[in-house]
Amino acid sequence: MDYKKSLNLPDTPFPMRGDLAKREPGWVAEWEETQVYQAIRAASRGRPRFVLHDGPPYANGDIHIGHAVNKILKDIIVKSRNMAGYDAHYVPGWDCHGMPIEIQIEKKYGKHLPVTEVQSKARAYALEQIDRQRKDFKRLGVLGDWHNPYLTMNFSNEADEIRVLGRILEKGYVFRGLKPVNWCFDCGSALAEAEVEYADRVDPAIDVAFPFTDRGALARAFGLDEVDAGAIVIWTTTPWTIPSNQALNVHPEIDYALVRVTPTPVHGPLLLLAQERVEPSLKAWGLEGEIIATAKGEALEGLRFRHPLAAAAQGYDRTSPIYLGDYVTLDTGTGVVHSAPAYGIEDFVSCKAHGLADSDILGPVMGDGKFVDSLPLFGGLSIWDANPRIVEALKLAGSLMLVQKLSHSYMHCWRHKTPVIYRATSQWFAGMDVKPRDGGPSLRESALAGIDATAFYPAWGRARLHAMIANRPDWTLSRQRQWGVPMAFFVHKETGELHPRTVELLEQVAQRVEKGGIEAWQSLDPRELLGDEAELYEKNRDTLDVWFDSGSTHATVLGGKDGVLGSSHGAELAWPADLYLEGSDQHRGWFHSSLLTGCMLYGHPPYKGLLTHGFVVDGQGRKMSKSVGNVIAPQKVSDSLGAEILRLWVASTDYSGELSISDEILKRVVESYRRIRNTLRFLLANVADFDAVGQAVPYGELFEIDRYALAMTAQMQAEVQGHYERYDFHPAVSRLQTFCSEDLGAFYLDILKDRLYTTAAGSAARRSAQTALLDITQTLLKLMAPILSFTAEEAWKVLAGSALAKQADAPRVTIFTEVYHALPPFADGEALTAKWTRLRAIRAEVQRKLEEVRSAGAIGSSLQAEVDLYANAADHDILASLGDDLRFVLIVSRATVHADADDLRIEIAASGHKKCERCWHWRPDVGQDADHPEICGRCVSNLFGAGEPRTRA
């Protein structure tokens, strides 16, 4: 007889190989066809709401690995929240306005298109990009409302954004002023703080002499009767700002020295600089000298010095006063700072504090980076081309003390990678320290209080955002662009004042934009709204900062705190969001702008929690770079290994820091995936012939080890759900892997194989095991589903078509409409766990000893062994309680327990009996049945009799 055929060998249509890259697109298509997202919404209706608001990626270019990380993390959270019993929608969004798209239109069609044409082409381009990105996001297994995303360029969104502008204007936060702002010559526009990055750059560093003018006043400041001719010396890395100099700054508490030097410089024998900087400066200039007098910086306030180019051109024949500044340091330079208020924030603040009018500020640099033609000596030159010319002019005027090359970290545009300057222009601002009209706290105060009330994951994000808000300048709202939401103001042509009915007019404009998009503002004739007043006003041409676009989506998409705005998705979502989740750069981006708009509109943040993930680097910790050749595209991984591998990589990596990825790392992830898949295959194969409705064993009648397995599963489930709740995904993955490999594979399933395969197919022993396995399988699949979505869905379909087929709510469309599995409580759960924890420890000792005996060649498999265990009272009771089932737990042919006062002692010997050809146990009763001499007594009983007596394992 072929006894192999008498075994209950496992069988399942769930294949060993996932073939993920080939099969996943089919699941994506099926989810689309069967409207899985809509099914989730229907199943979740009426539950507590959980809102993750999607930070919109920019609608330009293909998605990269960072996008994949971001979307997968969001998908894990939304799916896990739905399965935890929440109603968690996912409405994806896209950021659609702004410079990068304008650049693409310029590249394709040239720079001089009419504004309306730029806008229509930009809108069409953004839609094309969204379609490309949407396809790639869906390929990652991300479920969401892909047919109805929010777009910042939707007419309704553009209109509501104008309404948001009206509300913060009405509250008193918005003002117009001349201030130095980050300016990109290539953009031709102001930049937000988040649009500035730093890179090393080499610039000329120069020491420049400003000649004395009123030598009598200077002598008195130093307590002298008189002084010779000379100059005060400054140090700067921006020679191009020298033509715009309007003041000098010294620190009030620093000691300054008059130094008589030789050989005598052009402007005279005396030089004025900080005492502490005299020695290194003279050495650098090749001079010798002695200090003739010192004075505190405060004594120099108000003294005036001649412009260093006064001798070179009449246009520079002016003097600059000394102002006091606490920001002056002695780290480098001379301890004297030159001030060009149009091109430096501290310079601007200092000069304004001393009464300099906006109209008197010198700003010869135009928006394209060139000096105005009227500027003496350098008119028409770009500031960078002018640098060497200015240095040469200073040298000819006798005002150049030293020029050196300096490599330093400098501001650059994040789009063009070109240098950015501070440039004073007339812009619209949201005031950080302005008190709103209702008398409440300033924007800075309410934002800082809001940070304190927000949960941060990881916790260090709080200090980072707090420091940014505490130190940031006013928010420059305006941009000089074409493809953006207009700051739809009417400005008086003579006074520059806003129309007195501006808030009302903004609503009228918003109504038109709602029907025709921002193009409606472009084509609007002011007479339509202003009537006869139209001649007095002009349309403001500025657009809103794109960070205002995305930063106000909590109002335009979620509906805001008061629901006054229409909002595109207010019915599905809610304000405030439970969570915003983005990369760590968004502390200065979307997190930041959303916080400010939320606090201006409603007095507190639009989110309860902020989750930050790090950037992706290669296996050596280097940034992804095409030039280095270490870029890993998510599309390529999906097409070769499968998106499931990307999902598992994201979930198993600590996202709070940098996420490392390489071919080698992905190879290890593939191995982890295979182990999980093999566990699932075993589980599915062993419940394939099981009917959950008609064949389940009551929980109270389960074998002891089966009850322990369920208690163990419940403990694991609680831990994993806790990790999901706290957004700790890599410990969740680790726990699931440990459960599959150690708790199941190396322990429970290893022991269970004998009972599953050798007992009668319909026996209580086998059905007890299958009852437990079905609960374990359901628990495991539902816990895995947020991460391994394709695999969990595939396995769920197999399970729904077999063991669960006869349940009342079958067939189930998808695993994603399920909630986490409800496992039975066991009154003796703690006692069971304590007992079996000790049994597992003893089993591990036995296995170690068995391996020693096997290595010595005394036995082949562990089933050839017979074990005697000598145990103290406590261990003896535990081991003896299993009776003959102990041998199945230890996977040996005989296990005998002996009482002993000492600690555990294990003796192992090879069995002297014959091997059963069916169960492979070596038993004394093999051959005793004349009809079946090849098998043992229990196999005879299982095949032809009442079945073996067995209750523990």
Curated annotation (Swiss-Prot):
Q: Where is this motif: 'KMSKS' region?
A: 623-627
Where is it localised?
Cytoplasm
Question: Which amino acids does the record list as binding ATP?
Answer: 626
**Which domain of life, per UniProt?**
Bacteria
Q: Quick check: keyword Zinc in the entry?
A: yes
Share what the entry says about its subunit structure, partners included: Monomer.
This chain belongs to the protein called Isoleucine--tRNA ligase
Organism, as annotated: Bordetella parapertussis (strain 12822 / ATCC BAA-587 / NCTC 13253)
Gene that produces this protein: ileS
